[in-house]
């Protein structure tokens, strides 16, 4: 299931929609709903590891009256984790030019590799923005790297609920509580880096790190 209706639109329409969501006068900030890395993988049409070769500012559409711009990143795809049925070798990814429209700034012509998650638009172009999970590969934990191959997308039937304050509880057996913000005051803390929400044969979901069950302090959060 795609992250949003953006996947069904052309890239020019996506940019116009973002412009409506963040009009001039609202400020320069890009606002995104919190999502665990597992949710990002599940909700993205494409997940790849890549290096950025170059960038170029291009028009958002062929309409001469359209003044919107996009950044086209030329990439070298290293590995694809998701999206095999929709794309093969990705050469370019596109993002809004303005950071206020959630445009992504990536390093070009360096040895840095990135994990890129994004959507494949109706015209076949790959669209990324700041609300996707985009991280330098070297910053990912071993558990995150391994989970990209199997565990994340094999457990998309689990729901991850962000916990902001105690008490917080689950409302269904297929939910996992994400407590990084509560315990560490940051989203991508220890739990996001080292745990996967996995479904048991009985349909119950819970956090696992490899073969180890969730540490007790995370479980205790649900108690009033």
Swiss-Prot record:
Disulfide bonds join 30-102, 32-131, 42-156, 158-205, 163-168, 176-197. The keyword Zinc applies. PANTHER family: METALLOPROTEASE INHIBITOR, METALLOPROTEINASE INHIBITOR 4. Residues 1-29 form the signal peptide. Complexes with metalloproteinases (such as collagenases) and irreversibly inactivates them by binding to their catalytic zinc cofactor. Keywords: Disulfide bond, Metal-binding, Metalloenzyme inhibitor, Metalloprotease inhibitor, Protease inhibitor, Secreted, Signal, Zinc. SUPFAM superfamilies: TIMP-like. It comes from the Eukaryota. This is Metalloproteinase inhibitor 4. It holds the Pfam family TIMP. Zn(2+) binds at residue 30. Expressed in retina, smooth muscle, skin, pancreas, skeletal muscle, heart, brain, lung, kidney and testis. Not found in cartilage, spleen and liver. It is found in: Secreted. GO terms for molecular function: metalloendopeptidase inhibitor activity; zinc ion binding. SMART domains: NTR. Residues 30-156 form the NTR domain. Belongs to the protease inhibitor I35 (TIMP) family. GO terms for cellular component: extracellular matrix; extracellular space; sarcomere. The record marks 69 as: Involved in metalloproteinase-binding. Residues 30-33, 99-100 are annotated as: Involved in metalloproteinase-binding.
């Amino acid at each position: 299931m795609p992250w949003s209706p953006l996947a069904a639109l052309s890239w020019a329409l996506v940019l116009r929609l973002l412009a409506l969501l963040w009009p001039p006068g609202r400020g320069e900030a890009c606002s995104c709903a919190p999502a665990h890395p597992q949710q990002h993988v599940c909700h993205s049409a494409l997940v790849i590891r890549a290096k950025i070769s170059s960038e170029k500012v291009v028009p958002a559409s062929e309409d001469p009256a359209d003044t919107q711009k996009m950044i086209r990143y030329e990439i070298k795809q290293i590995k694809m984790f998701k999206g095999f049925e929709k794309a093969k070798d990705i050469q370019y990814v596109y993002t809004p030019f303005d950071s206020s429209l959630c445009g992504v700034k990536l390093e070009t012509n360096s040895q840095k590799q990135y994990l890129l998650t994004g959507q494949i638009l109706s015209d076949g172009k790959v669209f990324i923005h700041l609300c996707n999970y985009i991280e330098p590969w070297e910053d990912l934990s071993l558990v995150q790297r391994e989970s990209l191959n199997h565990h994340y997308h094999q457990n998309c039937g689990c729901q991850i609920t962000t916990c902001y304050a105690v008490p917080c509880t689950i409302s269904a057996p297929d939910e996992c509580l994400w407590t990084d913000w509560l315990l560490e005051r940051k989203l991508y803390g220890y739990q996001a880096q080292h745990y996967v929400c996995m479904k048991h044969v009985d349909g119950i979901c819970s956090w696992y790190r490899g073969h180890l069950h969730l540490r007790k302090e995370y479980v205790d959060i649900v108690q009033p």
